[in-house]
């Protein structure tokens, strides 16, 4: 995968979709979208969406702004809005992708500029157990329909972003 024609790189809401997020955030398994595309997602960007991926098992390669990164079990991938990225996962890779709109990011990060700086950097880093637990909670809540779901998702999003910022800081 190469990014030689940066002007020709597609911008998506979610890969292959053009509509905006209909929910507080979006969360899906890595396999859900990747398996449909033979485990390879071509270079693209999300102009108003921040993505956090967590590889539970399997692996592959991530391309972030033209730099190649190996993916491994326990890998956290931070993809800020506007950054070009592509993935080639090994078949049957398991994990999650959480997608947060800029508006939610702004709401959560209103008074924490240092955290915003950490999250503004695309990177692959080892996930902490706390981050993995937060991502699992986001997935469970997103998949359910319990009372106060939107409120809980907002809170879990803030927690997840906090753990991502810590991982980015440790990885720096």
At which residue positions do the language-model features occur?
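Generic protein-terminus/edge-of-domain signal
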Residues: 1-60, 67-69
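Ligand-binding loop in jelly-roll beta-barrel domains
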Residues: 81-104
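Conserved RecA-like P-loop NTPase ATPase core
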Residues: 52, 101, 138
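Short aromatic/basic micro-patch
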Residues: 46, 78, 99
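Short acidic-glycine-tyrosine-enriched beta hairpin
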Residues: 66-81
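Amphipathic alpha-helical segments enriched in hydrophobic/aromatic residues interleaved with Lys/Arg
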Residues: 114-171
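A short alpha->loop->secondary-structure connector
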Residues: 92-95, 105-120
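A cytosolic small-molecule/anion-sensing beta-strand core signal
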Residues: 56, 72-73, 91
């Amino acid at each position: 995968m190469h990014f030689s024609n940066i002007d020709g790189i597609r911008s998506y809401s979610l890969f292959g979709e053009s509509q905006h997020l209909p929910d507080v955030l979006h969360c899906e398994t890595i396999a859900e979208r990747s398996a449909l595309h033979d485990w390879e997602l071509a270079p693209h960007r999300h102009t108003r969406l921040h993505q956090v991926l967590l590889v539970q098992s399997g692996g592959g390669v991530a391309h972030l702004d033209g730099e190649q990164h190996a993916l491994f079990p326990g890998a956290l991938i931070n993809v800020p809005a506007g950054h070009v990225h592509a993935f080639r996962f090994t078949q049957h890779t398991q994990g999650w992708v959480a997608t947060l709109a800029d508006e939610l990011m702004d709401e959560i990060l209103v008074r924490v500029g240092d955290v915003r700086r950490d999250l503004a950097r695309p990177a692959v880093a080892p996930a902490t157990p706390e981050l993995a637990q937060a991502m699992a909670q986001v997935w469970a809540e997103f998949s359910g329909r319990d009372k106060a779901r939107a409120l809980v998702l907002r809170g879990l999003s803030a927690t997840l972003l906090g753990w991502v910022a810590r991982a980015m800081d440790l990885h720096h």
